[in-house]
Amino acid sequence: MAAPLALVLVVAVTVRAALFRSSLAEFISERVEVVSPLSSWKRVVEGLALLDLGVSPYSGAVFHETPLIIYLFHFLIDYAELVFMITDALTAIALYFAIQDFNKVVFKKQKLLLELDQYAPDVAELIRTPMEMRYIPLKVALFYLLNPYTILSCVAKSTCAINNTLIAFFILTTIKGSVFLSAIFLALATYQSLYPITLFAPGLLYLLQRQYIPVKVKSKAFWIFSWEYAMMYTGSLVVIVCLSFFLLSSWDFIPAVYGFILSVPDLTPNIGLFWYFFAEMFEHFSLFFVCVFQINVFFYTVPLAIKLKEHPIFFMFIQIAIISIFKSYPTVGDVALYMAFFPVWSHLYRFLRNIFVLTCIIIVCSLLFPVLWHLWIYAGSANSNFFYAITLTFNVGQILLISDYFYAFLRREYYLTHGLYLTAKDGTEAMLVLK
C-alpha cells in the first residue's frame, strides 16, 4: 500500500504547487470560506512584521494565532508554501496509519464477537471482510488530500491546516495506545484552537478500552487511569502555555487568542453561524447569546460519551464534525477533516436515508458561496441575508448529514444483535425508529 499512498501524495503536492504558482492563489487567500480572522495568513504576516519591529504581535486587534505559530513562521516564512504542503501530507499519513490500525482492532473485535455468538444469525451480510476494509486507509488519505476544501485551505495558507495535523496525530497516537503522546497532541490541538478539548472524552474512552479497563463509576482502575491521563493532558497544556509566556514575556496571547475565540468580537462573515446573529443583535444581549452559541460545541459531549462509550472512534468523528459546525470561526478546512472519515463508515451507506440530497445541498452551497458574496459585496444586488441564508443551509446540511450517519451507525449496531429482519408481536415486519 506504500506505492498507492506515495502516488496520492505526489498528485496532491503537484496540484498544490501548481495552484501556488497560479493567479488563483491570491484570490483563494481572500475567500471568507477558506480563511477566518483566526487562520488568515495575512494576519500572520502582520503579526510577524510587528514581532520584527520589537512590538508584541498582540498589541493590535489583528493577530490572533498562538505564539508557537508565529515563532514557527518567524524562521520558516520563506518556506511557508512548503510548510503547508508538508502539513497536509503529514495529516494524510497520520490518518492513513491511524485507520489502518483501527481496522485491525475492528476486525479482531468482530471475530471475537462472532466466536462468542454475540451476533444474530441472519446478519452475515453486515459482517465486514478484510478485502472490504483493505483500501479504506488509502481512501481516507485520498479523501483528505484531494478534497477541494483541503486544497483551497492549503493554497490560502490557512493555519487551520496545522490544527488538522495536530488532531490527526492525536487520533494516531490514541489508536496506537500511546497515552503520553496522545495527551501531548491533544494539549497542542487545544492550545491551538481550544475546541479540541472536547476530544478528551473519546480519547480517554478509547485508551480505557485498549487497556481493558471497564468504564464503570465504581471501578478503581477507571478512576486511576482517567486521573493519570487528565494529569498528562493538563500538565502538557500548562507546559505549552508557559513556554508561550517565556517566548513573549507576556500573557497578552491568552485574551488575544482564547478570549477572541470565546467572545467572538470580529464579525467578519464566514461559513459559521455566529457572525450574522451578533451583527444584528443589541449589544446588551450579546453575552447571553455568546454563551448559548458556544455551549453547542460542549453540550453534546456528555450524552454522546454515554451513548457511544463502546465506540469511541465514531464518537471522535461525530465530535470533530460538531466542532467544525459550531465553532466561532469555522472554515472549509475544518469541514475537510471530518469528511476524510467518510470511507471509514462506508459500511453504513446502506442505512443512510438522505445521503444523495444532503450531498447535493453541500455541493450546491459550496458553489453558491462565492456567487452570493459577489452579489452582496461587489454587485450590490444582494445583502447579507442572502449570504447568511446559504451559510445556514450549508450548516443545516452538515447537521443532517452527521445525524444521518449517527442514525445509520446505531441502526446497524441494533441489527447486529437483534437480527436484520425484525418482526412485530403480530408477526408483521417491524420498522426501526430512532427516538
Curated annotation (Swiss-Prot):
Q: Which family does it belong to?
A: Belongs to the PIGU family.
Q: Does the keyword Endoplasmic reticulum apply?
A: yes
Q: What Pfam families does this protein map onto? A: PIG-U
Q: What is its main location?
A: endoplasmic reticulum
Subunit composition?
Heteropentamer. Part of the GPI-anchor transamidase complex, consisting of PIGK, PIGT, PIGS, PIGU and GAA1.
What ranges does the Cytoplasmic topological domain annotation cover? 1-3, 100-136, 206-222, 307-311, 346-354, 407-435
The segments annotated as topological domain Lumenal are 23-78, 245-286, 373-384
Q: What does this protein do?
A: Component of the glycosylphosphatidylinositol-anchor (GPI-anchor) transamidase (GPI-T) complex that catalyzes the formation of the linkage between a proprotein and a GPI-anchor and participates in GPI anchored protein biosynthesis. Binds the lipid portion of GPI-anchor. May act as an organizer in the transmembrane layer to recruit other subunits, and thus is essential for assembly of the complex.
Q: Which Gene Ontology molecular function entries are recorded, alphabetically?
A: GPI anchor binding; GPI-anchor transamidase activity
**Record-annotated residues binding a cardiolipin?**
K216, K309
TM ranges: 4-22, 79-99, 137-158, 159-178, 179-194, 195-205, 223-244, 287-306, 312-331, 332-345, 355-372, 385-406
The places in or outside the cell where this protein is found are: Endoplasmic reticulum membrane
Q: Does the keyword ATP-binding apply?
A: no
Highest taxon, organism lineage: Eukaryota
Q: Give the protein's recorded name.
A: GPI-anchor transamidase component PIGU
Extract one GO cellular component term from the record. Answer: GPI-anchor transamidase complex
Give the pathway. Answer: Glycolipid biosynthesis; glycosylphosphatidylinositol-anchor biosynthesis
Where a 2-acyl-6-[6-phosphoethanolamine-alpha-D-mannosyl-(1->2)-6-phosphoethanolamine-alpha-D-mannosyl-(1->6)-2-phosphoethanolamine-alpha-D-mannosyl-(1->4)-alpha-D-glucosaminyl]-1-(1-radyl,2-acyl-sn-glycero-3-phospho)-1D-myo-inositol is bound, by residue? N383, N385
Q: Which UniProt keywords apply?
A: Endoplasmic reticulum, GPI-anchor biosynthesis, Membrane, Transmembrane, Transmembrane helix
Q: What's one GO BP annotation on this UniProt entry?
A: GPI anchored protein biosynthesis
Bilayer topology: Multi-pass membrane protein
